[in-house]
C-alpha cells in the first residue's frame, strides 16, 4: 500500500512538472516583455515532492557567458512575476517557488556535434587528397601496363 501511494506521488509530481514546463514555456514566449531575457528554452522542470519549489532548467542560445548570466539574472529577478502568471494558468493549491538554473547541456551538445562534423569533414578532405594522389601514383607505377591489359581484354571479346 505504501509503495502504491509513493508511486502515485511521484507520478503526480512528474505530471505537475510536465505541465509546469509547458506553461512556463508559453509564459516566457508570449507574456514576458523583458528584452533582457530574449529567446529562452525551458529544457526541464524538477518539482520537489512537497511542491514547495521547482528547479527550472533553461537554455539561451548565447555563447558569451556574461550575456547568459545577465539573461539568467533577469529571469531570477522576474521569477515571482512569472510564478504569478503561471499560477493563474494552473489549478494548484500551492504554486512552487521557481528557481531558474542555466542548463548548458544543449549548447554543449551542439558544440560537440559541430566538432565531430568538423573532424569528419577534415577526414573526408584528407581521404580525397590522399586518395587522388594514390590514384596518380598507381597510374605512374603501372603506367601503360593497365592500358595494355585493357586493350588485350577488348580484343578477346
UniProtKB/Swiss-Prot annotation:
Residues 127-157 are annotated as: Disordered. Disulfide bonds: none annotated. The keyword Ribosomal protein does not apply. Residues 135-157 have a biased composition (Acidic residues). GO terms for molecular function: ribosomal small subunit binding. Monomer. Binds 30S ribosomal subunits, but not 50S ribosomal subunits or 70S ribosomes. One of several proteins that assist in the late maturation steps of the functional core of the 30S ribosomal subunit. Associates with free 30S ribosomal subunits (but not with 30S subunits that are part of 70S ribosomes or polysomes). Required for efficient processing of 16S rRNA. May interact with the 5'-terminal helix region of 16S rRNA. This is Ribosome-binding factor A. It comes from Shewanella baltica (strain OS155 / ATCC BAA-1091). The gene is rbfA.
